[in-house]
């Protein structure tokens, strides 16, 4: 058996695949798994009780995680004039207007989040086919279309993230690094869950948090009891 196979078998022996755990227990399971040579990301995958085909059941928003994600973001800002100068001063990694639009049209997407001033959206909107599938398109709902670029950049640096349900009604979000202590991971997950519940469409019927799984990059996916999360 390969080292990879032995590691997976060892992981599976630490918990019951058919069981749902409390959030604290699930985090403990991830922490107990064999280590790897890099700091793994803690991801959550949430199946929502929505019909994503309906325009009034789209789930998208943002939340400031109390302990950040542990990831150093590469922030791009579409802006011109004074707002571009403000973005540069605030520490954005890439700042520009038409030049960045053309660069992205050519296939460059070497950044993690994009912010735009409202006056830039006419041109930025032309990048929908490139940015949309990568969840990089600035939107007012996510707070990434703004006149206050300084505040937005600061919030992103501190741990503000965007979440969006895909075509299957699933939200996949990185919420922490496995090196965070258990309480920090738990508080970040709870903040995300509270934001998801707040974003529940009024027309969504039945159970909203259908399935919730937490995992690490090289670790298992552990099912979390949604009854605990709904009560947050």
Curated annotation (Swiss-Prot):
Keyword rRNA-binding (UniProt): yes
One example of a Gene Ontology biological process annotation: regulation of translation
Pfam families (alphabetical): Ribosomal_L1
Ribonucleoprotein keyword on record: yes
GO cellular component: large ribosomal subunit
PROSITE patterns: RIBOSOMAL_L1
Swiss-Prot/TrEMBL keywords: Repressor, Ribonucleoprotein, Ribosomal protein, RNA-binding, rRNA-binding, Translation regulation, tRNA-binding
Gene Ontology MF annotations: rRNA binding; structural constituent of ribosome; tRNA binding
Domain of life: Bacteria
InterPro entries: Ribosom_uL1_bac-type, Ribosomal_uL1, Ribosomal_uL1-like, Ribosomal_uL1/biogenesis, Ribosomal_uL1_3-a/b-sand, Ribosomal_uL1_CS
Assembly and interaction partners: Part of the 50S ribosomal subunit.
Function: Binds directly to 23S rRNA. The L1 stalk is quite mobile in the ribosome, and is involved in E site tRNA release. Protein L1 is also a translational repressor protein, it controls the translation of the L11 operon by binding to its mRNA.
Family: Belongs to the universal ribosomal protein uL1 family.
Protein name per Swiss-Prot or TrEMBL: Large ribosomal subunit protein uL1
Gene (UniProt): rplA
């Amino acid at each position: 058996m390969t080292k990879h196979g032995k590691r997976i078998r060892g992981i599976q022996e630490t918990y019951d695949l058919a069981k749902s755990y409390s959030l604290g227990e699930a985090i403990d399971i991830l922490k107990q798994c064999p280590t790897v040579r890099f700091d793994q990301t803690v991801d959550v995958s949430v199946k929502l009780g929505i019909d994503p085909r309906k325009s009034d059941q789209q789930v998208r928003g943002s939340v400031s995680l109390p302990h950040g994600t542990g990831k150093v973001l590469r922030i791009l800002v579409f802006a011109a004039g004074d707002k571009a100068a403000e973005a540069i001063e605030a520490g954005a990694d890439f700042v520009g207007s038409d030049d960045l639009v053309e660069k992205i049209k050519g296939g460059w997407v070497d950044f993690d989040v994009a912010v735009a001033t409202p006056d830039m959206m006419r041109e930025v909107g032309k990048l929908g086919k490139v940015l949309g599938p990568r969840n990089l398109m600035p939107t007012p709902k996510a707070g990434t279309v703004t006149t206050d670029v300084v505040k937005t950049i600061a919030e992103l640096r501190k741990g503000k993230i965007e979440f969006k349900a895909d075509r299957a009604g699933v939200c996949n979000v990185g919420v922490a690094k496995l090196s965070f202590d258990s309480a920090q991971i738990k508080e970040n997950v709870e903040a995300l869950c509270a934001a998801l519940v707040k974003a529940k469409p009024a027309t969504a019927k039945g159970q909203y948090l259908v399935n919730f799984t937490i995992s690490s990059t090289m670790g298992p996916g552990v099912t979390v009891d949604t009854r605990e999360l709904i009560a947050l």
